[in-house]
């Protein structure tokens, strides 16, 4: 007889091989047809008591998505779904940053020389087309990753109503008195020909000169000091700025010496000056810094006067203690000179070349002007050193960290230009400054990780006023009018509202297309002929920083609460979007636009190196999806400590694939063995079932808590350990005998099936937010007792607690099992046995039912017969004897419980009788 036909073997249509790369797109297509998945999530939670709004930080609509984009969006969507399955109403409106330099540069490359013949309107139209193209491309790429969001109604910062909303936000800040225009040194990208905000600057190593230059004091200064001659020795790393020198700064709290050679240094730095060979160190006089105040020295390049001033910014950690001061080329220089009413000189044009200011202000001798005007400043350094002659006391080169433009990757300069600023230190917010209010709001914000509050807090504490103007074409205009005669900017509610309404209807392009008379009301008190336009555009960080107002507060989008529950981006956004949003939100609402901030690290290769095409270590999301499947990409993120940098490689993805297979195969086994279960009624669970349900209760609860705290790696670690060690490693293995060999309705079998069904149901609930595709697929093959009324994954819920804790203390049994298998390993190694079914176990206690103990140790039976002892061990003073089973192997269940090898054991005989009946 073929006894295999009599066994209740597992059966399921849920495939062992996931075939993710081929099958995922089909399921994703269903999710996105008519926005099915997102709309269903909204509908299912329309009466929810709680809500969760994640406001999407907009990526640039430029280029294809990379693995960092995938990390960011998948993490966002997972958190959204975590709250959804908690029973909360959720909103996730994706967006794109459509303005700015990255897009404009790409368009410039496409247009080439043609750009010079185009109007601003035409250039902006090309930019708009470029952004639109990549919005569509990126949207499809995100959807190919199965990311669920309101893709049919995204926000785009270039939409007409959005540009109007950005402009209205700017006007609100102006009305608060926090906006001003002034000439001030700002980071300037000569390569991009535009001002930059702090967030648009990155630091790289750069080689520069370190020079010490003598500026001779004039006769009056020497007389006042009582010396025949003296020279201040200034230190600088930017020789090209010496032509614009207006002052020399000393620290007012330090003493300065005049050496025997007539050189002036800070007393605290004299020793280092001796070491450099600049002086013998013999002191002629020592004076307090303030005795030098307002004396004048002579610039050796042009003979112009340079005033000695006091500056708290002068440090004693290097240099000479006397700082070359060019107020047009440094923020500290600017503020120090401002106190003395010293003129700001700016002899450098927007492309980084010396201009006619050299001639107009006499900054170089006339015979040198032809050589220097039009010369790029970085090419002028060597020429400047040569011109200094004997006044150049010391010159060397060194490597230091220097600011670079984040887009052109060229070094930037400080350049004084007229720009628009949001003021950090004006007490305009109920007597408080924007800086003070922003810091207060940070203390009310939850950070993941908590260290984030210190990081952004120190940045807010030390940041300068925010330069929000740019001298480019593609952006939202700072659409203000000036009086033609007085050049005063006009802040007027009537004009603000009228321009905003035009932008809403025609877009911000109208600022360039329309004449002034068409941009003001017909009955306006202002005469169009007396007005002129401001043509600067807004920093894109202002665009993105005001998205909360346009998306959450405008009513234009079904995007959730007016204050976002969470902002989630890479850790670099402490100085970027998190901060710009904080400043805009606090400025207009005196409140941060978010309740919490979560940051993630960056993606690197297996060795922790940054990915680049030149290194050949780039792994694109599309490659992962087509090679391994999106589910593997998701699991890679969720198994990683995303707060730190995440390493990715084929090797790592293969390891993640192994973990996925463990999860999938466990689900498959559970489904296959509950396929014929008719109900969940059981008189009493067996001890082993109580044990696994108790273990599952603890693990599921801990994993759920970890997921709810966004600690996905911790949650999965607990879960995978349970699936491998407890569920698959012990329980499923020891349950096979009763599942396969007991009668269909046997109490022991049903107890196991019900336990497995309960575990399967909760496991699918728990994985729904993380591995939605796999859970959705599993539900199609699950017993109705597991899936209930769920038509798909979006009908599942984590609102019910899994509570089957029977208070089982398994310490004794786990210790006994461990020691038992230590002995089994020895017996197998010595080739005494091949299987534990060849054994019986002899015990002297009756704490547990013998039948269940036999299953626990996977032996044929618990026996007190006098049999051959193969091994012994002891646990808590209880003795265990491993004996050689004396009966024959049952041809059906393979346990050694039969009288002869042809006859089934008593249990199997009973089952067979039932089948024959």
Curated annotation (Swiss-Prot):
GO terms for biological process: isoleucyl-tRNA aminoacylation. Zn(2+) binds at residues 890, 893, 905, 908. A motif ('HIGH' region) lies at residues 59-69. Disulfide bonds: none annotated. Its cofactor is Zn(2+). L-isoleucyl-5'-AMP binds at residue 569. One of its GO terms (cellular component) is cytosol. Keywords: Aminoacyl-tRNA synthetase, ATP-binding, Cytoplasm, Ligase, Metal-binding, Nucleotide-binding, Protein biosynthesis, Zinc. A motif ('KMSKS' region) lies at residues 610-614. It catalyses: tRNA(Ile) + L-isoleucine + ATP = L-isoleucyl-tRNA(Ile) + AMP + diphosphate. GO terms for molecular function: aminoacyl-tRNA deacylase activity; ATP binding; isoleucine-tRNA ligase activity; tRNA binding; zinc ion binding. It comes from the Bacteria. NCBIfam families: ileS. Binds 1 zinc ion per subunit. InterPro entries: aa-tRNA-synth_I_CS, aa-tRNA-synth_Ia, Anticodon_Ile_BEm, Ile-tRNA-ligase, Ile-tRNA-ligase_type1, Ile-tRNA_ligase, M/V/L/I-tRNA-synth_anticd-bd, Rossmann-like_a/b/a_fold. IleRS has two distinct active sites: one for aminoacylation and one for editing. The misactivated valine is translocated from the active site to the editing site, which sterically excludes the correctly activated isoleucine. The single editing site contains two valyl binding pockets, one specific for each substrate (Val-AMP or Val-tRNA(Ile)). Monomer. HAMAP family: Ile_tRNA_synth_type1 (MF_02002). This is Isoleucine--tRNA ligase. Signal peptide: none annotated. SUPFAM superfamilies: Anticodon-binding domain of a subclass of class I aminoacyl-tRNA synthetases, Nucleotidylyl transferase, ValRS/IleRS/LeuRS editing domain. Belongs to the class-I aminoacyl-tRNA synthetase family. IleS type 1 subfamily. It is found in: Cytoplasm. ATP binds at residue 613.
């Amino acid at each position: 007889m073929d006894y295999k036909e009599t066994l209740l073997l597992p059966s399921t249509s849920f495939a062992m091989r996931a075939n993710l790369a081929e099958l995922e797109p089909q399921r994703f297509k269903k999710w996105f047809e008519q926005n099915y998945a997102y709309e269903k999530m909204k509908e299912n939670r329309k009466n929810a008591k709680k809500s969760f709004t994640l406001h999407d930080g907009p990526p640039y609509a430029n280029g294809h998505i990379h693995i960092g984009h995938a990390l960011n969006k998948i993490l966002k969507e997972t958190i959204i779904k975590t709250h959804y399955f908690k029973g909360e109403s959720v909103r996730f409106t994706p967006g794109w940053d459509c303005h700015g330099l990255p897009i404009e540069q790409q368009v410039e490359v496409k247009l080439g020389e043609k750009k010079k013949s185009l109007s601003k309107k035409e250039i902006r139209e090309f930019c708009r087309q470029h952004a639109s193209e990549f919005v569509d491309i990126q949207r499809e790429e995100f959807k190919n990753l199965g990311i669920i969001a309101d893709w049919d109604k995204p926000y785009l910062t270039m939409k007409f109503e959005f540009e109007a909303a950005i402009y209205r936000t700017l006007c609100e800040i102006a009305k608060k008195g926090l906006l001003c225009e002034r000439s001030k040194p700002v980071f300037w990208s000569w390569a991009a020909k535009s001002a930059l905000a702090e967030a648009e600057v990155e630091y790289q190593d750069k080689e520069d000169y370190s020079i010490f230059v003598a500026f001779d004091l004039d006769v009056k200064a020497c007389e006042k000091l009582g010396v025949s001659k003296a020279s201040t020795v200034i230190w600088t790393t930017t020789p090209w700025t010496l032509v614009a020198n207006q002052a020399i700064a000393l620290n007012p709290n330090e003493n300065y010496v005049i050496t025997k050679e007539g050189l002036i240094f800070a007393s605290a730095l004299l020793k280092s000056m001796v070491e450099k060979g600049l002086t013998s160190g013999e002191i002629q006089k020592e004076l307090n810094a303030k005795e030098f105040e307002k004396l004048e020295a002579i610039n050796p390049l042009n003979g112009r006067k340079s005033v000695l001033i006091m500056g708290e910014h002068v440090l004693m950690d290097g240099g000479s203690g006397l700082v070359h001061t060019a107020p047009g080329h440094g923020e500290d220089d600017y503020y120090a000179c401002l106190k003395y009413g010293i003129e700001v000189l700016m002899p450098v044009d927007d492309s980084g070349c010396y201009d006619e200011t050299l001639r107009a202000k006499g900054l170089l001798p006339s015979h040198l002007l032809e050589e220097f005007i039009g010369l790029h400043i970085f090419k002028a350094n060597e020429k400047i050193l040569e011109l200094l002659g004997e006044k150049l006391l010391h010159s060397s080169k060194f490597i230091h960290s220097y600011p670079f433009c984040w887009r052109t990757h060229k070094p930037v300069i400080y350049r004084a230009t007229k720009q628009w600023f949001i003021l950090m230190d004006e007490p305009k917010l109920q007597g408080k400054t924007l800086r003070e209010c922003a810091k207060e709001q940070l203390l009310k914000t939850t950070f993941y990780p908590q260290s984030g509050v210190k990081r952004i807090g120190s940045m807010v504490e030390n940041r300068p006023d925010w330069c929000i103007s740019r001298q480019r074409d593609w952006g939202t205009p700072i659409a203000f009018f000036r009086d033609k005669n007085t050049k005063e900017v006009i802040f007027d509610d009537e004009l603000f509202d009228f321009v905003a309404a035009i932008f809403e209807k025609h877009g911000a392009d109208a600022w360039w297309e329309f004449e002034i008379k068409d941009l003001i009301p017909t009955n306006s008190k202002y005469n169009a002929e007396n007005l002129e336009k401001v043509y600067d555009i807004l920093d894109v960080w202002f665009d993105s920083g005001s998205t909360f107002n346009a998306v959450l507060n405008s009513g234009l989008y079904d995007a959730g609460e007016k204050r976002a529950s969470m902002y989630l981006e890479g850790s670099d956004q402490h100085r970027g979007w998190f901060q710009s949003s904080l400043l805009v939100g606090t400025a207009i609402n005196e409140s941060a636009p978010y309740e919490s901030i979560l940051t993630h690290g960056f993606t690197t290769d297996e060795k922790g190196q940054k990915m680049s095409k030149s290194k050949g270590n780039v792994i694109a999301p599309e490659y992962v999806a087509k090679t391994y499947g999106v589910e593997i990409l998701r699991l890679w993120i969720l198994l990683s400590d995303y707060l730190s940098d995440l390493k990715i490689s084929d090797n790592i993805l293969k390891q993640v694939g192994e973990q996925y297979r463990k999860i999938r195969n466990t689900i498959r086994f559970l489904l296959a063995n509950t396929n014929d279960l008719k109900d969940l009624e059981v008189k009493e669970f067996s001890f082993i079932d109580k044990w696994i349900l108790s273990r599952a209760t603890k693990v599921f609860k801990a994993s759920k808590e970890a997921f709810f705290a966004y600690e996905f790696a911790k949650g999965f670690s607990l879960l995978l350990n349970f699936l491998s060690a407890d569920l698959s490693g012990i329980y499923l293995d020891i349950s096979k005998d009763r599942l396969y060999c007991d009668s269909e309705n046997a109490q022991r079998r049903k107890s196991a099936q019900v336990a497995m069904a309960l575990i399967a149901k909760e496991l699918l609930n728990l994985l729904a937010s993380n591995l939605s595709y796999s859970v959705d697929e599993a539900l199609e093959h699950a017993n109705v007792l597991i899936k209930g009324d769920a038509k798909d994954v979006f009908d599942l819920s984590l609102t019910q607690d899994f509570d089957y804790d029977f208070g089982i203390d398994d310490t004794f049994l786990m210790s006994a099992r461990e020691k038992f298998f230590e002995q089994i390993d020895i017996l197998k190694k010595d080739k005494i046995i091949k299987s534990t079914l060849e054994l019986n176990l002899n015990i002297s206690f009756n704490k547990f039912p013998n039948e269940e103990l036999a299953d626990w140790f996977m032996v044929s039976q618990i026996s007190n017969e006098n049999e051959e002892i193969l091994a012994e061990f002891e646990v808590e003073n209880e003795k265990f004897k491993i004996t050689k089973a004396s009966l024959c192997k049952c041809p059906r269940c393979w346990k050694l419980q039969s009288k002869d090898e042809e006859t089934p054991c008593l249990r199997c005989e009973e089952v067979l009788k039932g089948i024959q009946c």
